[in-house]
Amino acid sequence: MIPGEYHVKPGQIALNTGRATCRVVVENHGDRPIQVGSHYHFAEVNPALKFDRQQAAGYRLNIPAGTAVRFEPGQKREVELVAFAGHRAVFGFRGEVMGPLEVNDE
């Protein structure tokens, strides 16, 4: 095996089947590229990214684990988000939630 190599079965792999999703339009108003990882609580990303943060609360990018999306300065694009699952508790990031999402979902 080569470090970083994947051994997967042939065919398509379905990600996040059955989970709630939403789409948001995001625009980078900053002067530098901003990269957002697959499991970052999207409502807490860099403030230079402008979008409906309330809609994004409790969601992350709907992309494969360990990958990221890069937003270049001035770039505007639509992304798909997927709801956090499991215990639905968020800690860290920018410290805006620090606990169960349902308490903050009002």
Curated annotation (Swiss-Prot):
Single GO MF annotation: urease activity
Subcellular location(s) of the protein: Cytoplasm
Classification via InterPro entries: Urease_beta-like (IPR002019), Urease_betasu_sf (IPR036461), Urease_subunit (IPR050069)
Activity dependence on pH, as recorded: Optimum pH is 7.75.
Superkingdom in the source lineage: Bacteria
ATP-binding among keywords: no
One Pfam family linked to the record: Urease_beta
Database matches in PANTHER family: UREASE
Annotated HAMAP family: Urease_beta
Protein name (database record): Urease subunit beta
Organism classification: Bacteria, Pseudomonadati, Pseudomonadota, Gammaproteobacteria, Enterobacterales
